[in-house]
Amino acid sequence: MRPLPGALGVAAAAALWLLLLLLPRTRADEHEHTYQDKEEVVLWMNTVGPYHNRQETYKYFSLPFCVGSKKSISHYHETLGEALQGVELEFSGLDIKFKDDVMPATYCEIDLDKEKRDAFVYAIKNHYWYQMYIDDLPIWGIVGEADENGEDYYLWTYKKLEIGFNGNRIVDVNLTSEGKVKLVPNTKIQMSYSVKWKKSDVKFEDRFDKYLDPSFFQHRIHWFSIFNSFMMVIFLVGLVSMILMRTLRKDYARYSKEEEMDDMDRDLGDEYGWKQVHGDVFRPSSHPLIFSSLIGSGCQIFAVSLIVIIVAMIEDLYTERGSMLSTAIFVYAATSPVNGYFGGSLYARQGGRRWIKQMFIGAFLIPAMVCGTAFFINFIAIYYHASRAIPFGTMVAVCCICFFVILPLNLVGTILGRNLSGQPNFPCRVNAVPRPIPEKKWFMEPAVIVCLGGILPFGSIFIEMYFIFTSFWAYKIYYVYGFMMLVLVILCIVTVCVTIVCTYFLLNAEDYRWQWTSFLSAASTAIYVYMYSFYYYFFKTKMYGLFQTSFYFGYMAVFSTALGIMCGAIGYMGTSAFVRKIYTNVKID
């Protein structure tokens, strides 16, 4: 084995450069959140959009609202995560100072012509509401309302702000919309506001607690689903262990007895079972380049999921705009050597020679899938003039991360994988000529095993899927990452158990095509998750329109595919260890 000081040095240098490049972007905090008396407090206007379509958002001033008179304000620097999530912070123009009350005052006037009235009427008909920020605390308000007959429409013109402070920090913000004014063409509408400062006992670190919903996320159903999944894991692990231990013990006893027979008795005997394919079970999988790239990508997705959940459990990422996405991008880039190591080593063990091509496919498989979907949805967002349209500069930044961070780190991982664990070390010799696969019952066919393999893993997570979907597609903040970690562990255990059982029955039917079968049977969980997303869309939401529908099903396809690749890699890795173990313990001539 050759030493790799150069590769290790490159890995260390690349990782250090990556940290310096991306780590500052993982925090959305531009300020210290401390103020002096009379110091300026900025009210940012974010986006406006229909209530039932959370992702269909537009710039606040795309509606004909007017801007306050205050003009001097420092520029806001958005993070990568904010840019990708469509955050569009614009200065409101309102003059607000720390601990300085503002009596009701007019800050601007709307000259309401027919075009502006129609824009407001459309927004009110579609239940538009807007989001604002003060000191990174979100505030929501509705644009207006219609009368019972739907003939007259009214605009809320008075923003009554109550801001709580504890010491020199802002800990609470409340908005009350008042001043309902009927929308009549060719009239002038005065927009006004007031600010009331109140001393609060809320601690700064607890100021986001009001936005959480413990009654929803810690409902008895949530606890029961976790308990139910945990009991299923215990039952499944016990069942698998009992079946395999008893069955394998009988198999080993039968094979040991066969070893004691002479050649004539062995020829007359009825040989069957998984031992018969010992010369083919470690044969390289079909399409090894794609297979190894999928395994490497799945291992990386698992590493990203594990690290991000741990970080979210330690840090309250939900308190900063875009921090979850920024952290995920940073961790994905940083874990690129994991992809290269597992994908490159597997490809080398399977005798692959085009390792550079495999490295490129492994590095860009997931980014290409995500960027391709985002590119398609971006066209629709541009057509709708939605804030979700990704700016060109952000696209360039993402491409730079892919080519100058992910690709070099993936190369380092591939080189390490090929040199450290790329040599075949199978317990059985691979025959030169493949063994014919005998006919078997229909339910032992790989296609049937693949379709059925994802049912139990999906059953262990589908309740958690509801809470995750609701937090993303509705107006809930997901914060119970301990639940998510437990569900991830349960999913891994169930997936490995199911794929081991499926692989055992496949090998016992003397079918040695277990690599793709183990991967796809675990990955089929994604099919059930995507099918569940259809149920959630039609029965749990009131989404409508081309943009929101495309956004929903496009990114749900990305999420389901990534989950499937991760489960497939987990299933294959567990099954590979199982197959190696059982053939190591069998005496082969």
UniProtKB/Swiss-Prot annotation:
Principal place of residence: membrane
GO cellular component term, pick one: membrane
GO biological process, one term: protein localization to membrane
Entry membrane topology: Multi-pass membrane protein
Positions of transmembrane segments: 224-244, 294-314, 328-348, 360-380, 389-409, 449-469, 482-502, 519-539, 551-571
Family matches, as InterPro entries: EMP70
Tree of life domain: Eukaryota
N-terminal signal peptide: 1-28
Keywords carried by this UniProt record: Glycoprotein, Membrane, Signal, Transmembrane, Transmembrane helix
Subcellular location: Membrane
Glycosites: 174, 419
UniProt similarity note: Belongs to the nonaspanin (TM9SF) (TC 9.A.2) family.
Protein name: Transmembrane 9 superfamily member 3
Source organism (scientific name): Homo sapiens (Human)
